[in-house]
A protein has these predicted regions:
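Structural signature of tandem alpha-helical TPR/SEL1-like repeats
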Residues: 21-29, 33, 55-67, 89-101
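Alpha-helical segment of the N-proximal tetratricopeptide repeat
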Residues: 6-40, 54
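Terminal, low-structured helical/coil segments at or just beyond the last alpha-helical repeat
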Residues: 4, 8, 96-125
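Structural marker of alpha-solenoid helical repeat scaffolds
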Residues: 3, 37, 71, 88, ...
Length: 125
């Protein structure tokens, strides 16, 4: 049975459900076909980046978040998620930079707290 645009929408929605159900690897598998058919789909790439992060696949998560930010440099969530990825990978200076960009783009309390504007970048204070 050939894949159709509807199939990809169904796979995307199913991947969202799998990620919510804590099955990030299953989500990645579904999203691989969606992204193969629609490589420009930023929403699918962002969801796959989140799934990679949830599966502790930090390098693939980093690459996907960076690709999203190349296309949408004002995406505060992508900056925040990339910062969390860097933080988890033990790269505090890069994490702080993206936490601060996220907070500057969208002053959500969670972003502002993570940005730690009152401390030096990467100091962990």
């Amino acid at each position: 049975m050939p894949e159709s645009p509807e199939t990809h929408v169904i796979d995307f929605r199913a991947a969202e459900q799998l990620l919510a159900a804590r099955d990030p690897r299953g989500a990645v598998k579904l999203l691989d076909s969606v992204i193969a058919a629609h490589p420009e789909n930023t929403a699918a790439r962002l969801l796959r980046a989140r799934a990679f992060f949830a599966a502790a696949q930090l390098r693939p998560a980093e690459l996907e978040f960076e690709l999203v930010l190349e296309r949408e440099p004002d995406n505060a969530f992508a900056h925040f998620a990339l910062a969390r990825t860097y933080e988890r990978a033990g790269r505090p200076e890069q994490a702080t930079k993206h936490f601060r960009l996220a907070a500057a783009l969208d002053p959500k309390p969670e972003y502002i707290k993570a940005a730690r504007f009152d401390s030096a970048p990467g100091s962990g204070d």
